[in-house]
Amino acid sequence: MKNSVSRRDALKTLAGAAALASLSRVSAAEPASPTSAAMPTPSSAAEPAEQFHHSVCRWCYQKTPLDELAKNAKEMGIGSVELLNPEDFPTIKKYGLTCAMVFNPTAKTPQGVTVGGIPKAWNRLEYHDTLVEAYEKRINEVADAGFENLICFSGNRDKMDDQQGLENCAVGLKRILPLAEKRGITLSMELLNSKVNHKDYMCDRTPWGVELVKRIGSERFKLLYDIYHMQIMEGDVIRTIQDNHKYFAHYHTGGNPGRHEIDETQELYYPAIMRAIKATGFKGHVAQEFVPARDPMTSLRQAVKLCTV
């Protein structure tokens, strides 16, 4: 698309500005209008007042006992500790916390292949029977606990065409959606990078994931948009959120490069990203999924403050 202001137009504007220099100096000396200075910008005036909710991913704090992590999370105003298995639910419930995204189940196929994790999952038809059984059990566990979200993965390509993988994922996931819909559980497939952390992972770009959501056609299947991972694969994070937020059920953070703190030591400007998420009217959870390089609880507290907009 051609820019609305060309280089030639810009040069003409600069030439005209020189002729108005004296007038500009006079205008600059005049005090600003108190009324105009107090008026909010259109973007801030349009922002929803309600803040989305905060969560933290358990695996990033493995050296911290879950009980201690839950206690600290509660004190920081974090409402969820996530990526937990059912045996961990009672611990966080003691502190009045939820699990905003429950960990995926894994199981062995009759051939002894462990499926359900990142590399081997829904893009293989031969895994579907095992996955359906494992996920139906986990869906019931999540619902019985009073939680609402369950993570899932595409699996790696392993030389499979992306379109074939898309079709296979849709076939398999549609088998468990009736139960998910009945129990009020949203399945969220995570977008992960295949460049640095998860080589060969299939659901590694937003358009692929969005197409899968459209094919499945259920409000109980959406995407987990991981800001760190998609910065590596696509960039253009804020525009992607603005254009596709209706397909996203959950968000993860992380500093890039390195997946450490989300502060000024990395390239993403999280306050602006959080404002973009808030502006969509999102009422779900944004989870901190960075690996602390400094004191873990101090870094977590700083991240939550940074993401409260």
Identify what each model region corresponds to.
Residues 14-22, 48, 119-222:
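Active-site acidic/histidine proton-transfer and metal-coordination neighborhood
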Residues 60-62, 85-87, 105-107, 156-158, ...:
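Active-site-proximal loop/turn and secondary-structure-junction residues that shape catalytic pockets
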Residues 69-88:
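Catalytic domains of carbohydrate-active enzymes, especially glycoside hydrolases
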Residues 90-103, 185:
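Short acidic, glycine/proline-enriched helix-loop-strand junctions
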